[in-house]
Amino acid sequence: HKKIIYDGFVETLGEHVAIDFYIYNNDFALFKKLLGNAREDYSHFVIIPHFIEGGENAHEIINTIPRHKLILLDKKVPGVNGEYGAVYENFENDIYNALEQALKQLAKYHTLKIIFPEKSYYPKGILKGFNRFCQEYAFTHKVVHDIAKEPINSGEVYINVMEADLVTLIERLITMKYKIGKHIGVISYNETVMKKIILNGITTISTDFHQMGVKAAELILSGAKDHIEVPFKLTLRASL
């Protein structure tokens, strides 16, 4: 999905803008090193601040960037102060609202499980929204760290955030007698073209990544310091 963000960003900025693209693989130590060595003549720093571990002090290094040059993308970072641009997801509310929209389909299941690796760059706000929804609507619920070892039973819905976990889940499901969308439900984070086809269509919950890139570019072009929350969408398909 980062490629989709980048494409929207580049298309909106136009061909007369030079972009240096740095990949830090969600490694905070590498991120800190890259930012420390970055050229001072950049007009802007557009940062996607997701870290697998060690990012608790990310605000300290980000706060060294002049505010008029800073745009945070996908996630806001507590402790980053001053006036700067941001285009972000509201992770807690997004999953809560998406599941609420799917209540009719979820009603035939009794248990919701979210596959969330212990070491993940995905924000814990996702788990807060998931737990809040399940508690308010009386679903049995569980956070699963390793889907390869998790018992799978009829009446359960599985929500994945990592693509690798979706592959493992599907590999297990196709060997079982359960019918997807009847006995077992599947919801996947982040819309892709393939999810329209796999299992006759996988239900997705996803932000508009292209729009995220477009809005970030518009902040640069306009010089605005707005904080823009990107819409989040539920796409219902046969897997639920």
How would you label these PLM feature ranges?
Residues 1-37, 41-43:
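Amphipathic helical "hinge" segments at domain boundaries
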Residues 13-25, 82-85, 111-114, 127, ...:
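Short beta-strand elements in bilobed, periplasmic/extracellular small-molecule ligand-binding domains
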Residues 49-93, 190-200:
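Flexible loop/hinge segments that line or gate small-molecule binding clefts
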Residues 94-135, 228-240:
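An alpha-beta-alpha
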Residues 53, 76-113, 166, 206-225:
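Hydrophobic alpha-helical segments within soluble ligand-binding/sensing domains
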Residues 152-154, 164-240:
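Flexible loop/turn connectors
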Residues 42-51, 71, 113-117, 154-163, ...:
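Periplasmic-binding protein-like
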Residues 2-15, 94-101, 121-139, 168, ...:
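Short, solvent-exposed amphipathic alpha-helices that sit
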